[in-house]
A protein has these predicted regions:
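TRNA-recognition modules of translation machinery and tRNA-sensing kinases, especially anticodon-binding
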Residues: 1-420
């Protein structure tokens, strides 16, 4: 490696400091909510045989045509770094014999995703997702549970007020086939007005044109045929059941007939939570039903639904002050009290308190660093405190001090420590 090359690969980022605190907070919330809804954690490898994704994402999808990291290993196998979770989770579900287990199964995953995209704010070539999947999910209650769950994640992160829920229903396979024919006929009339990407999709997958972010394409969507015109009675009834249940739970939503999601495996309900910032709608969290994907990969008919959210996108919307936990500092006047202070720090950590212990012997230097560490309290042990089994506690926000017995420390913190 040449000199000066010890830096990040373009599109990657190191996580440390406030960033890693935000990251871990989001993962902790995602895990806790998964547990509350009886999801089991499942981790898949970060690379799969390329066929896992190529068979299922759609050959003309942006992910496959522009964004995947694909390589050949020494055994001449083509492998792909994971560009999304669902196909990998379905592969694991089939490979590990889950088809023969209980009818309804729920899986939670998180980890890195890789897409060779143009790096920009909130979008890197390696980023992270939280991901939830339900297999055997035939009931419309599963659809609504996923939306409620997604909304709860945003609420726990205090960003639900920034999110707009959009839903659509893609119907069954026949609905999509009929709709694709009509869309192709409509957009062919405006071929010269379409972007190059949409012209390419016109022959292969006209539904994907509706996923375009090009303003020139979007202007044509207004008068385009709507998928509801091609619903079967079952699809129409299913959408009504879903919206009735959303209304029952007072969940606000917008029905967006142009919402199709970017991957071919979706059918039935699709949804997105978007952030309408400066007139540009950015997707925060998205998902939908994919009732045909398991059958496509295994021959077994298993209904399924899932959603995912980009952790870095959530981090951009989350305030650091909401999650920053403040440590308690343990300080000592001289080296004679260092062991006593070290024992207090050990005691606090064993009781799940965040504790900073300074190894520097200079007391003035210890106290000078407290402001940098954003400590709420400083516990100070001098010669008198060590002899009398007492602690001097200084509230660094208020600048006041008090003396307590060692045995009263937990009681004091339970009443005064803001992280409780």
């Amino acid at each position: 490696m040449a000199e000066g090359k010890f830096q990040n690969v373009r599109g990657t980022k190191d996580l440390f400091g406030d960033d890693i605190e935000q990251f871990n907070n989001i993962i902790d919330i995602a895990k806790k909510i998964a547990q509350n809804y009886c999801f089991s954690e499942l981790q898949t490898p970060i690379f799969e045989f390329s066929e896992v994704f190529e068979r299922n994402l759609g050959q003309d999808s942006d992910i496959l045509t522009k964004e995947v990291y694909k390589f050949k290993d020494r055994s001449d196998n083509y492998l792909t770094l994971r560009p999304e979770f669902t196909a990998a989770i379905v592969r694991s579900y089939i490979a590990n014999g889950q088809l023969n287990q209980i009818a309804l199964q729920k899986f939670f995953s998180f980890g890195p995703i890789f897409r060779y995209d143009r790096p920009q704010k909130g979008r890197q070539r390696q980023f992270h997702q939280i991901n939830y999947e339900i297999f055997g999910a035939k009931n419309h209650y599963c659809d609504v549970e996923m939306i409620i769950m997604a909304q709860e994640i945003l609420a726990k992160l205090a960003i639900s007020d920034q999110a707009i829920l959009k839903i659509n229903h893609l119907g069954c396979a026949k609905t999509k086939e009929k709709y694709a024919v009509k869309l192709q006929q409509y957009f062919t009339k405006y071929r010269n007005d379409l972007s190059q990407d949409s012209i390419a999709r016109l022959e292969t997958n006209p539904l994907r044109i509706l996923d375009s972010k090009n303003q020139q394409d979007q202007a044509l969507f207004v008068n385009a045929p709507k998928i509801e015109q091609f619903y079967s009675p079952e699809s129409k009834d299913n959408l009504q059941l879903i919206t009735d249940l959303l209304d029952e739970f007072n969940i606000k939503y917008q029905l967006d007939q142009n919402l199709v999601r970017g991957l071919d495996y979706y059918s039935g309900l699709v949804f997105e939570f978007v952030n309408d910032h400066d007139g540009a709608q950015n997707t925060i969290l998205a998902g939908g039903r994919y009732d045909n994907l398991v059958a496509k990969m295994s021959g077994n008919d298993v209904a399924a639904i899932g959603f995912a959210a980009g952790v870095e996108r959530l981090m951009m919307m989350t305030q650091i002050s909401q999650i920053k936990k403040r440590p308690i500092a343990v300080n000592y006047i001289s080296d004679n009290e260092k062991l006593a202070a070290f024992k207090v720090a050990d005691f606090l950590r064993k009781h799940n308190y965040i504790c900073d212990f300074s190894f520097a012997g200079n007391f003035k230097r210890q106290m000078k660093k407290l402001g940098q560490k954003n400590c709420q309290f400083a516990i100070i042990i001098g010669e008198n405190e060590a002899k009398s089994q007492k602690l001097m506690i200084k509230n660094l926000d208020q600048g006041v001090e008090c003396e307590i017995a060692n045995d009263d420390l937990l009681n004091f913190l339970s009443k005064n420590y803001e992280n409780n």
